[in-house]
Swiss-Prot record:
Belongs to the CoA-transferase III family. CaiB subfamily. SUPFAM superfamilies: CoA-transferase family III (CaiB/BaiF). It catalyses: crotonobetainyl-CoA + (R)-carnitine = crotonobetaine + (R)-carnitinyl-CoA; 4-(trimethylamino)butanoyl-CoA + (R)-carnitine = (R)-carnitinyl-CoA + 4-(trimethylamino)butanoate. Catalyzes the reversible transfer of the CoA moiety from gamma-butyrobetainyl-CoA to L-carnitine to generate L-carnitinyl-CoA and gamma-butyrobetaine. Is also able to catalyze the reversible transfer of the CoA moiety from gamma-butyrobetainyl-CoA or L-carnitinyl-CoA to crotonobetaine to generate crotonobetainyl-CoA. InterPro entries: CoA-transferase_III (IPR050509), CoA-Trfase_CaiB (IPR023452), CoA-Trfase_fam_III (IPR003673), CoA-Trfase_III_dom3_sf (IPR044855), CoA-Trfase_III_dom_1_sf (IPR023606). CoA binds at K97, R104. GO terms for molecular function: L-carnitine CoA-transferase activity. It is found in: Cytoplasm. Disulfide bonds: none annotated. This is L-carnitine CoA-transferase. Keywords: Cytoplasm, Transferase. The active site is at D169. The gene is caiB.
Length: 405
C-alpha cells in the first residue's frame, strides 16, 4: 500500500484507519489513532460537512492530523470507491444509528469480501441488534448516560445531573480505539477480520459499575453525592477552604490517624466504630461519618488552600486544588510536561489546546497538521487507490465526491 503524504511517527505508523461519523464519539476514536501515527481518513458527506465544523475552536483539536475525504459511500460509483478504499484499510470505524450500514447494503460480509483482514468497529447508541424499540434510535452523550444508569448516579442528592463535557462520547470513542487495536492484534495472528459492536449505553453501564454492584448483589443503591462529596466515604470529594475549593481522598491508616488529630477527633480512633487500622470511613455505615464531615468542613474552612496542601503533603493525604481553566497554562506541572501546546491551522493561524496523550517514550505522537477543509484530500486519496483525474472528475460531476475548491 502506498501511503498518503505525511510524516512517519508514533507507534501506529503504517496503519490505515478510516472513519465515518460526525460530532464526537466516532471521530474521537479516529483522533487517537491519528495522534499516535496512523494514517487516518475522515469521510464526510458530499453535500453537508460534519456538523462539528460549526464550532469555532474545538474541531481544530478533534480533527487535527486527519485526511479529509468527501464521498457518497452508499451510492453507485461512490460506493465502489469506498469499497476500493477498504481493500487497503486496516481499521474501519463507523458511528451511526444501529445497523445503518447493513440496512444500506454495506454489511460486514460485503466489507470482508473486499478485505478479509479488515477490523470493523460499529459505534451506536444502543448497539447493532436488540429490540426494535431501541436499536435504531439516535443517541448522544446525555442519551447514553440516561439509559445506562450512569446519569442517575451523578448530580446532587436532590437532582440527578449528566456529566459534562460529553463524557459518554469520549468513553465510547476510547472504547472503540482500544477494541479495534485488540481486534487488530488477533487479526495479525489469524488473518481473519473482526467486527465490533460498541453500544454507547453499554460503555456507560460499565463506567457506572462501582456503585451498581451493590444493587445487583444486595439490592442497595448508593445515594447521590451531597455538594460534590463522595457518597460512600467520608473525607473524600469536594471541599471548601477559606479561599476556594479542593478535592481530597482521606484514605489510609496513618492518614486517617493524623488527620483526626488535626480536626480534633483523635479520641474516636480505636473505638468499635473506627477501630485501629481503619483505612476508609464509610459515610453511611459508620455512625461517626457525619461528625467526621462536620469537623473536616470546619477545619478546611478555617485554612487557605495553600495551608491545606502543605499540611496534607506532610500527612501524605491526596489533595488537589480545583483549578480554573485560566490557571492551567501557568501551572508548573503543565509547563514541565507541555500539557498545553500550539499548532498551526491550515489557514496559518495559531491554535492552542491539549497536547497529545499519553506520552510514548520511544515512538512519540506528534501534531503534523491542522483540521483539513471539506474535501481537501479527496483527490489525493482517490489517486492513492488507483483513480485517474478523469475518474475523479466524473465522481464530482455526478455529485458523488467533493474536492477542495
Amino acid at each position: 500500500m502506498d501511503h498518503l503524504t505525511m510524516p512517519k511517527f508514533g507507534p501506529l505508523a503504517g496503519l490505515r484507519v478510516v472513519f465515518s461519523g460526525i460530532e464526537i464519539a466516532g471521530p474521537f476514536a479516529g483522533q487517537m489513532f491519528a495522534e499516535w501515527g496512523a494514517e487516518v481518513i475522515w469521510i464526510e458527506n458530499v453535500a453537508w460537512a460534519d456538523t462539528i465544523r460549526v464550532q469555532p475552536n474545538y474541531p481544530q483539536l478533534s480533527r487535527r492530523n486527519l485526511h479529509a475525504l468527501s464521498l457518497n459511500i452508499f451510492k453507485d460509483e461512490g460506493r465502489e470507491a469506498f469499497l476500493k478504499l477498504m481493500e487497503t484499510t486496516d481499521i474501519f470505524i463507523e458511528a451511526s444509528k444501529g445497523p445503518a450500514f447493513a440496512r444500506r447494503g454495506i454489511t460486514d460480509e460485503v466489507l470482508w469480501q473486499h478485505n478479509p483482514k479488515l477490523v470493523i468497529a460499529h459505534l451506536s447508541g444502543f448497539g447493532q441488534y436488540g429490540t426494535e424499540e431501541y436499536t435504531n434510535l439516535p443517541a448522544y452523550n446525555t442519551i447514553a448516560q440516561a439509559f445506562s444508569g450512569y446519569l442517575i448516579q451523578n448530580g446532587d442528592v436532590d437532582q440527578p445531573m449528566p456529566a459534562f463535557p460529553y463524557t459518554a462520547d469520549y468513553f465510547s470513542g476510547l472504547t472503540a480505539t482500544t477494541a479495534a487495536l485488540a481486534a487488530l492484534h488477533k487479526v495479525r495472528e489469524t488473518g481473519k477480520g473482526e467486527s465490533i459492536d460498541i453500544a454507547m449505553y453499554e460503555v456507560m453501564l460499565r463506567m457506572g459499575q462501582y456503585f451498581m454492584m451493590d444493587y445487583f448483589n444486595g439490592g442497595e443503591m448508593c445515594p447521590r453525592m451531597t455538594k460534590g462529596k463522595d457518597p460512600y466515604y467520608a473525607g473524600c470529594g469536594l471541599y471548601k477552604c477559606a479561599d476556594g475549593y479542593i478535592v481530597m481522598e482521606l484514605v489510609g491508616i496513618t492518614q486517617i490517624a493524623e488527620c483526626f488529630k488535626d480536626i480534633g477527633l483523635a479520641h474516636l480512633l480505636g473505638t468499635p466504630e473506627i477501630p485501629e487500622g481503619t483505612q476508609l470511613i464509610h459515610r453511611i455505615e459508620c455512625p461517626y461519618g457525619p461528625l467526621v464531615e462536620e469537623k473536616l468542613d470546619a477545619w478546611l474552612a478555617a485554612h487557605t488552600i495553600a495551608e491545606v496542601k502543605e499540611r496534607f503533603a506532610e500527612l501524605n493525604i491526596a489533595c488537589a486544588k480545583v483549578l480554573t481553566v485560566p490557571e492551567l497554562e501557568s501551572n508548573p506541572q503543565y509547563v514541565a510536561r507541555e500539557s498545553i501546546t500550539q499548532w498551526q491551522t491550515m489557514d496559518g493561524r495559531t491554535c492552542k489546546g491539549p497536547n497529545i496523550m499519553p506520552k510514548f517514550k520511544n515512538n512519540p505522537g506528534q501534531i503534523w497538521r491542522g483540521m483539513p477543509s471539506h474535501g481537501m484530500d479527496t483527490a489525493a486519496i482517490l489517486k492513492n487507490i488507483g483513480y485517474s483525474e478523469n475518474d475523479i472528475q466524473e465522481l464530482v460531476s455526478k455529485g458523488l465526491a467533493k474536492v477542495e475548491d
